[in-house]
């Protein structure tokens, strides 16, 4: 589904280089120290950064130079980027038509995803009238209504309390399984990663330093566990 072949981005003339393959329907966590290049990796996949070299394939098609708006990718950030002057219904509708002129089929898609997110009763409210968790549900609905096969999450739930964060992670995981979406999620928490991502990638110094089973990282048995401050539990 998603393949990066020597995708390179120059940061102050220092190259960050990524080679990666992710299958359709996989849920993968991207972990690593601050400043390691995790968000850079997502931004390269989404098209917000242009690589200096390399190839990016999605579903077998070359999207290395495809503009972000035309890539089969949706991305959710920590800052939800909702438009404060538009209500929930309109913010979700932007995912279908920037001009907000929706046909009957598009309106049904908008309303269906709102029901799935549990926000159908909030459609006439403005973002400022919502809680943090509700705003992230709206932002997630706007991503999902686009029906793109790849979903990128850049720590969108890190500001939420632990119980709400787990609820949102479970919701995302369930939807990705239901729709067979390919998910890549940046997180600082290996515990969060373990909840939804069987496989993890550890980024360090602009490279993929390790990839494998998330449980191995969490147990401290992986070679990259130390990069995340995780010690082995075996005496």
Swiss-Prot record:
It is a peripheral membrane protein. Residues 2-230 form the ABC transporter domain. It catalyses: thiamine(out) + ATP + H2O = thiamine(in) + ADP + phosphate + H(+). It is found in: Cell inner membrane. Its main location: membrane. Belongs to the ABC transporter superfamily. Thiamine importer (TC 3.A.1.19.1) family. The complex is composed of two ATP-binding proteins (ThiQ), two transmembrane proteins (ThiP) and a solute-binding protein (ThiB). This is Thiamine import ATP-binding protein ThiQ.
